[in-house]
Every structure is written in structure tokens, then in C-alpha cells.
């Protein structure tokens, strides 16, 4: 059954870790999205792999069963922010890339919203506790932000940066 103290790992590394093309692609993504190590990239790839596997299993089902089970998957991915509309098809699910998953990370969204000057600065703000989602402090840069939570990302109320953004504090 497994040891209850130790959680199952959420990632699977590449089957061929020393291929030049894979290494170059991974390093480019790690740099572009400010990831700390390749494990964070592999976690995103594993999530995408699971989603695509579910979509492929649905495609193998008969039409009436597929239609019934397709809607919950598509709506869940829409709420996660991975799909552009709730009317998306399984082909849209299968066309998702690892970049789509990495764009939903809190670190990336903080940078894209302009709360941080660089992607690495966004990571530092999050780990130091300056960023809140729904007025709740989140210290994990890898937190996947849902479509509903995206509008509620701001500086944490107790953070000196929040006071600076409001114009309250002069010397911080």
C-alpha cells in the first residue's frame, strides 16, 4: 500500500534524460518560466500527461458515453484556465502543451500582471509571503491559479509592498 508518511511523487522524469533536444527544450522552459529546477517542469508535464490520457480514453468510448463524460472534463479544464472556452472539444484538450500549464502557475501570473519586474522577482515575492490569492497568503510559486482566482491576485494585506502600492509607506 505504501507508507502513509511519504506522499507519492507527482512527477516522472524523461525516459531518455540525455537527449540533446530534450535538454535544450527543458532549459529554455526553465529559464523562460523561472523554474527552480527541472522537477517543477516535470510536474507540469505529468499533469498534462494525465489530462491527455483521460481525453484519449474518452475518445475510445462509444459516442453517447463520450458525450456524457466529456463535458465534466472540459468544464474542469476551463475552470483551471487551461481551455479558452467551455465549448472546447477533446481535440482542444489533446492540443494542450506544457506551456499552457506553466502559464497557469502563480509565479507566471504575478509576473504577467505586473506585480513583479521579472519572473524570478515574482518567485521571490511569493516565497517571501508578499502575494495573496483571495486575501489568503500563498507561498508556493507552483500553485495553479484557477480562472476564478485570477482576478483576486494582489499583494498580501500585511506586506510592506501593499502599503507602497497604495501610497501609504514612504520608507520601506
Curated annotation (Swiss-Prot):
Taxonomic lineage: Archaea, Thermoproteota, Thermoprotei, Thermofilales, Thermofilaceae
Subunit description: Part of the 30S ribosomal subunit. Contacts protein S5. The interaction surface between S4 and S5 is involved in control of translational fidelity.
Gene responsible for this protein: rps4
Name used for this protein in its record: Small ribosomal subunit protein uS4
Domain of life from the UniProt record: Archaea
Role this protein plays: One of the primary rRNA binding proteins, it binds directly to 16S rRNA where it nucleates assembly of the body of the 30S subunit.
SUPFAM superfamilies: Alpha-L RNA-binding motif
One Pfam family in the UniProt entry: Ribosomal_S4
Native source organism of the sequence: Thermofilum pendens (strain DSM 2475 / Hrk 5)
Recorded family membership: Belongs to the universal ribosomal protein uS4 family.
Cysteines engaged in disulfide bonds, as pairs: none
S4 RNA-binding domain: residues covered: 104-168
A biological process from GO: translation
A GO CC annotation given for this chain: small ribosomal subunit
Key words, A-Z: Ribonucleoprotein, Ribosomal protein, RNA-binding, rRNA-binding
GO molecular function: rRNA binding; structural constituent of ribosome
